[in-house]
């Protein structure tokens, strides 16, 4: 028992003391009102409960932004239209940037990837290319954006269509999901790490790639946090960035828990720094 106490004490000493950013970066982001849509990594309740600070708290300190936070634990792309409705009800057009950081729960829920478009052959008039005459009708393939809430791409289409309609003059930025470690959050919420495929046979990489595709489909910037943030929960050397990197007993239930899915304050600070320097390349205000 004494040996266990000594090990725990040493682990506590090894945890990093998270310093606040030394100074604000002077940029076009100072004073920008940024709405954050997403899941548990964005959820403000983790700050309110004292679990850890978040990337958007650190962005306030790094860039001087103002945060409007709508992310909710467990939410998927299918919840983004509802978060958008709440943003509209609360702030109307008084927002500069909408940032969407979601998708990891779609992977965990085994949501099929689906398609961006359906396709059909239609008869259409074509004028202008060499060899065509005015009024000539010809068969051409035509695609239609799929609004399908049962697939990942379809959900993104629904959400982005709503955001583009509601905020045509605002900066909308997508963030990819980040790497996933194992998480034993409760007896009813056990999630294996990213080396495991989900229930439809897809790895989390596929869900990251689809968000990157969405940038081209919907003409919005995508920041690939999965690649640039540096958080890699599969490596023991990265244990210092996660909320509960090793099995430990819950103070409430006494049951063992682990969490390499949610960054701790040190992890969120690293996220924020990576994100801040990417954001410097984009305008914060378009209208």
What are these language model-derived features?
Residues 84, 156-160, 208:
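Generic structural signal for well-ordered alpha-helices
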Residues 40-43, 72-77, 103-109, 178-182, ...:
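Solvent-exposed loop/turn segments at secondary-structure junctions
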Residues 1-4, 170:
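Positively charged n-region of N-terminal signal peptides that target proteins for export
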Residues 5-9:
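Sec-dependent signal peptide hydrophobic core
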Residues 10-18:
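Hydrophobic h-region of N-terminal signal peptides that target proteins for export
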Residues 47, 177-287:
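Catalytic His-Asp segment of secreted/periplasmic serine-dependent ester chemistry enzymes
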Residues 49-50, 79-150:
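Oxyanion-hole/transition-state-stabilizing segment in secreted/luminal serine hydrolases
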Residues 19-73, 78, 83-94, 98, ...:
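Serine-esterase "nucleophile elbow" of acetyl-processing enzymes
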């Amino acid at each position: 028992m004494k040996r266990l106490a000594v090990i725990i004490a040493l682990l506590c000493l090894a945890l990093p003391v998270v310093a606040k950013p030394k100074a604000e970066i002077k940029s076009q982001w100072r004073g920008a009102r940024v709405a954050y849509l997403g899941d548990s990594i964005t959820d403000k309740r983790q700050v309110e409960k004292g679990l850890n600070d978040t990337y958007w708290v650190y962005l306030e300190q790094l860039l001087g932004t103002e945060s409007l936070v709508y992310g909710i634990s467990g939410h998927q792309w299918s919840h983004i239209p509802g978060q958008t409705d709440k943003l509209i009800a609360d702030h109307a057009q008084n927002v500069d940037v909408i940032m969407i950081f979601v998708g990891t729960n779609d992977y965990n829920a085994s949501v099929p990837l689906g398609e961006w478009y359906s396709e059909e052959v239609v008869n259409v008039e074509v004028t202008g290319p060499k060899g065509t005459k005015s009024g000539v009708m010809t068969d051409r393939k035509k695609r239609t954006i799929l609004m399908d809430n049962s697939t990942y791409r379809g959900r993104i289409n629904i959400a982005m269509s709503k955001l583009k309609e509601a905020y045509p003059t605002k900066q909308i930025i997508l963030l990819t999901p980040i790497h996933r470690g194992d998480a034993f959050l409760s007896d009813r919420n056990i999630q294996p790490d990213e080396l495991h495929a989900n229930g439809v046979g897809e790895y989390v990489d596929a869900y990251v790639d689809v968000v990157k595709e969405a940038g081209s489909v919907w003409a919005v910037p995508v920041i690939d946090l999965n690649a640039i943030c540096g958080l890699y929960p599969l490596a023991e050397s990265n244990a210092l960035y996660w909320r509960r990197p090793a099995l430990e007993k819950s103070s409430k239930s006494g049951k063992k828990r682990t969490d390499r899915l949610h960054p701790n304050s040190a992890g969120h600070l690293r996220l924020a720094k990576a994100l801040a320097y990417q954001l410097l390349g984009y305008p914060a205000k378009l209208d």
